[in-house]
UniProtKB/Swiss-Prot annotation:
Membrane-spanning segments: none
Keywords: ATP-binding, Lyase, NAD, NADP, Nucleotide-binding, Phosphoprotein
CDD domains registered for this protein in UniProt: YXKO-related
Top-level EC class: lyase
Native source organism of the sequence: Anopheles darlingi (Mosquito)
UniProt-recorded name of the protein: ATP-dependent (S)-NAD(P)H-hydrate dehydratase
C-alpha cells in the first residue's frame, strides 16, 4: 500500500466498511433515498443513485417527478423509482418511505419548480422530526439559500456546495468563513467541492482540506457521484460504534473516492472522460483504497 493510502483519516474510513458476511441480509449495508430529477435533468439523480449502489449500499430509491421517472428507470433496472415528487399528495405518498431509509440525498437534478421546491422543503421538515440524516446538494442548496432555517441546528445534515454555491451560502470573504458557517448552528457539516475539497464541521469549528486533487478534466456529474457515495459512507459511519466524527470521515472518504475515480478514468480516457467513465472505476478505486484485505 502506498504511503498516500496510509493517512489516519483514510484508515478510519476503511474501518467503516462492513465486512461481506454471509449472515447479513439485504438492506443492512444501506437503504438510500435520492430526492431529485426533473424533465431537463435526469442524469444527476441517476449518477447519485448508481454511485451509492456501486460503493456498497444494498437498495436505492429515487423520488422524482413523473416526467423524469421513465427515463431514470431506463438507465438502470437496479434503481427503485417513485414518480411522486410533483403529485398532488406527494408528501402523503413519500412520507411512509422515509422511515425505511437510512440516509437521503436531496437535490440532484431537482430544478427550480416552485411547487416541487415547496414539497421538498416540507420533506426536509419531516426528516428533521424523524432525525433522518440528510445530504443536500445542487438545487437543494438553492432551497437552503432561500431559507437557512430549514437546516439550522439540524444535527446530521451535510451540505455539498461547489465554489459558487458556497459563496451564495456563506459569502466571498474567506476570512469570515467559519463565522458565516456559524449561521448553520450546531451539527451541520459542509464539504466545499473544488481542486482540493474542504470539510467544515460547524459543531467543532474543525476544518480539513482533502489532499487528493484528481485530474484537470472537470466533467459534469462528479458532484452527483460524490453525493451518492457520501450517502453510503455516511450511513456506515453513523452505524460505526468507534467513529466519533462520522460526517467528517464520510466526507473525506467520498471526496477521496471521487477524486481517485477521476484520476483513474482520466488515465484511461483522457479528455473524452465523462462521469460514466468515473463510475466505471468505482469498483477498482474501492478495492484499492477501502476494501478489507486478507492477510
Amino acid at each position: 500500500m502506498s504511503s498516500e493510502n496510509k493517512s489516519p483519516l483514510l484508515e478510519r474510513a476503511r474501518n467503516l466498511v462492513p465486512h461481506l458476511e454471509t449472515e447479513r441480509h439485504k438492506g443492512q449495508a444501506g437503504r438510500i433515498g435520492i430526492v431529485g430529477g426533473s424533465l431537463e435533468y435526469t442524469g444527476a439523480p441517476y449518477f447519485a443513485a448508481i454511485s451509492a449502489l456501486k460503493v456498497g449500499a444494498d437498495l436505492v430509491h429515487v423520488f422524482c417527478p413523473q416526467a423524469a421517472a421513465q427515463v431514470i428507470k431506463g438507465y438502470s433496472p437496479e434503481l427503485i423509482v417513485h414518480p411522486l415528487l410533483d403529485s398532488n399528495n406527494a408528501i402523503i405518498q413519500i412520507e411512509p418511505w422515509l422511515e425505511r431509509l437510512h440516509v437521503l440525498v436531496i437535490g440532484p437534478g431537482l430544478g427550480r419548480d416552485r411547487l416541487i421546491l415547496q414539497t421538498v422543503a416540507e420533506l426536509i421538515r419531516i426528516c428533521r422530526q424523524l432525525q433522518k440524516p440528510l445530504i443536500i446538494d445542487a438545487d437543494g442548496l438553492f432551497l437552503i439559500t432561500q431559507d437557512i432555517g430549514l437546516v439550522k441546528d439540524y444535527y446530521g445534515v451535510i451540505l455539498t456546495p461547489n465554489a459558487i454555491e458556497f459563496c451564495r451560502l456563506f459569502g466571498k470573504d474567506r476570512d469570515q468563513t467559519m463565522a458565516s458557517l456559524g449561521r448553520l448552528g450546531a451539527g451541520v457539516t459542509v464539504i466545499e467541492k473544488g481542486l482540493n475539497d474542504r470539510i467544515y464541521d460547524s459543531l467543532t469549528s474543525e476544518k480539513y482540506e482533502c489532499p487528493q486533487g484528481g485530474s484537470g478534466r472537470r466533467c459534469g456529474g462528479q458532484g452527483d457521484l460524490l453525493a451518492g457515495a457520501l450517502a453510503t459512507f455516511y450511513y456506515w459511519a453513523l452505524e460505526s460504534k468507534q467513529e466519533i466524527s462520522p460526517a467528517m470521515v464520510a466526507c473525506f472518504a467520498a471526496s477521496t473516492l471521487t477524486k481517485t475515480c477521476n484520476k483513474y478514468a482520466f488515465k484511461a480516457k483522457g479528455r473524452s472522460m465523462t462521469c460514466s467513465d468515473m463510475i466505471d472505476q468505482i469498483h477498482q478505486v474501492f478495492d484499492d483504497l477501502f476494501e478489507h484485505k486478507k492477510d
